[in-house]
């Protein structure tokens, strides 16, 4: 089932005086299936972060439509956007965005507190998520007492505890060492495989993208190519991704 639909999305930024325009996205169209793990790649300035911000409802497109499970984003009033994001979207950022004055437990539960979920239900949701992400022993610690990889696992727990329709991850391995990056990506793959989480991840890393089932390449605000994993393993998919990135940098056609 198509969970997310991006239809002819265009984004144009105009200077205050209206003298200069910058086209960040040019008629982008694609869909994300429910239960899919998809990565978006592209060079700096390609438009991938702009696209993610629009999908996250943090920005509005100049033209085009976005639908989440059939609901057009354009129908959500500005004053209702925070509630819409909290109920439908989970976020994982490069810099964790945990509150240092809150324990790991309280950071994870914060979205549920804002939604006024009963305490018993919050605890019932927390335990299986903490167990899956191996952070049960960290719940009473504070962010400054744990490692970067552990912080990011807590951030993932915060993203999934609301049972969002889709998880949006922006360079989630960018602040992690190689070991923590692999652990995080394995957790993403497990959440996708065992829980059915739909994940859309923006990344510069071919290694990170190799954990996805599909990779979309963006260049100069347009879709350049896409790759499907198929039956190959991570290593084979990584090699194909690197080949496409090479062609992308040279401006050639999709090599498949």
Language-model region placement:
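ABC family nucleotide-binding domain
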Residues: 2-4, 9-218
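Conserved beta-strand-loop-alpha-helix hinge in the C-terminal portion
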Residues: 222-247
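Short acidic DE-rich linear segments
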Residues: 255-256
């Amino acid at each position: 089932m198509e969970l997310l639909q991006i239809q002819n999305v265009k984004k144009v930024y105009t200077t205050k005086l209206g003298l200069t325009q910058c086209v960040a996205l040019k008629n982008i169209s694609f869909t994300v299936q429910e239960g899919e793990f998809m990565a978006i790649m592209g060079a700096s300035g390609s438009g991938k972060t702009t696209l993610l911000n629009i999908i996250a409802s943090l920005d509005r497109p100049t033209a085009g439509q976005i639908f989440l499970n059939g609901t057009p984003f354009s129908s959500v009033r500005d004053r209702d956007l925070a509630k819409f994001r909290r109920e439908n979207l989970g976020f994982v950022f490069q810099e964790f965005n945990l509150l240092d004055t809150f324990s790991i437990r309280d950071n994870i539960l914060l979205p549920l507190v804002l939604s006024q979920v009963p305490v018993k239900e919050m605890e019932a949701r927390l335990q299986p998520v903490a167990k899956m992400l191996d952070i049960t022993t960290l719940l009473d610690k504070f962010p400054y007492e744990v490692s970067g990889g552990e912080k990011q696992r807590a951030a993932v727990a915060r993203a999934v505890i609301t049972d969002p329709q889709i998880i949006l991850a922006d360079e989630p391995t960018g602040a992690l060492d190689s070991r923590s990056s692999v652990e995080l990506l394995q957790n993403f793959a497990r959440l996708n495989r065992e829980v059915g989480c739909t994940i859309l991840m923006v990344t510069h890393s071919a290694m990170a993208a190799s954990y996805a089932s599909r990779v979309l390449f963006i260049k100069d605000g347009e879709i350049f190519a896409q790759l499907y994993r198929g039956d190959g393993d991570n290593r084979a998919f990584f090699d194909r991704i690197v080949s496409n990135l090479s062609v992308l940098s040279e401006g050639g056609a999709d090599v498949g």
